[in-house]
Amino acid sequence: MAAAIDGSLPVCRQSAALIDGVHTDFLASWYSDRILVLVTQFQKFGTLVSVTRDQPVARPDQAQGGTDSHTFTTKVLMGDDLPIWHVYGQQIFKAINGEDGCKPVLVAIALQNHSPEILKCILGQLESIRQVQTP
């Protein structure tokens, strides 16, 4: 999938869905150095969050079958710096990049409400956008 996306940058994909009864627009744009993700119910950017995956930290039990522990750096660049936007940013990073992706993500998010159910809907929509094959 990454090879298909990297071949002809930038690639933009968009969709819309009803989430909790509210029309929600989605846009994902892949550039050579980062990914831009827009999730809005207000037709504007809202809060802007920068998310990067830090270098993996090897755990002492990794030799016995443990896994790498990834950490993330999230920074609100514009808007309300609420803890929920850091959580949304990290989860959106994972959904749009895939498990092994490391490209920094810039998330613009404007929602009427937030909850675990709304986040699940957003992640599902973004994963389907990521999986769409390019023409």
Curated annotation (Swiss-Prot):
Chaperone protein which promotes assembly of the 20S proteasome. May cooperate with psmg1-psmg2 heterodimers to orchestrate the correct assembly of proteasomes. This is Proteasome assembly chaperone 3. GO terms for biological process: proteasome assembly. The keyword Chaperone applies. Gene3D superfamilies: 3.30.230.90. Signal peptide: none annotated. Keywords: Chaperone. It comes from Nematostella vectensis (Starlet sea anemone). Belongs to the PSMG3 family. Pfam families: PAC3.
